[in-house]
Amino acid sequence: MNKKQLILLCMLAVGGSVQAQQWPDTPAEARPGTRWWWLGSAVDEKNLTYNLEEYARTGMGAVEITPIYGVQGNDANEIQFLSPRWMEVLKHTQAEGKRTGIEIDMNTGTGWPFGGPEVSIEDAATKAIFQTYNLEGGKEIEQDINVTDPKQQPYSILSRVMAYDEKGKCINLTAYVKKDKLQWKAPAGKWKVIALYIGKTRQKVKRAAPGGEGYVMNHLSKKAVKNYLSRFDRAFKNSKTSYPHTFFNDSYEVYQADWTDDFLEQFARRRGYKLEEHFPEFLNESRPEVSRRIVSDYRETISDLLLENFTCQWTDW
């Protein structure tokens, strides 16, 4: 080894030593995090402490608590979600997280999507139910108008009954329906009558933890989302527990949740025309140009309501 090589090696060794000494501590947000499944919320202080110490030892910076269904045969150790005992173990977890340098995050619910025992059928995920009747005009018409799906009959609400002739004329017949019967002196011609019912998806929370079972909420309703979040406000306030570092949403896996109570009013205000005057085009599965444009407006309105009534309200909360 010549003199130049020896000098270079010495410089590299000194430089590496200086860099190692100057390297800053890695903050929690720069370290990896992990999902922390609480199976049945069957947890206790001793084991929570042990797990957090192990997470810290291996370099973890955050955990995301998600309560989920329990292990078969371990029911006796399960804790009801947001119960006083559940809040106790969460408070312990937060204290230990602070001690070990780990940020504690939490799902705003159990399993997925958001929902639970305090979600009433009124606040549950909502869908549109359309029924079509082809009627001959030029006479007094008496037609039964009722939702045919027996599972929807206890919950569905009649929203609109609209009539359309072959020339595109539209008449709102909602006021002519009394006790599930349409009574209408129809002008001559062939009429397509479309009834819109506001129904419920009846979807339940998937993989719910004990105390988290119930209907999925209506993410498109400002009132339903507010009511859902109020359960958390009460639990944290009554137990004097600090909110976690971050709340998160596991997923938005809702099925057929394509409507909300004031959707028609919201659509008219945002898109500048009444969707109910174009139900035939909206429901046309062959999708000509006008139908595609109407469906696009419908989807944009759904997007607006999801953003404003769920995402923004939840984030502001």
How should each PLM-predicted stretch be described?
Residues 21-26, 31, 43, 47-49, ...:
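Mature extracytoplasmic enzyme cores
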Residues 66-79:
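Glycine-rich, proline-tolerant flexible connector loops at the mouths of alpha/beta enzymes
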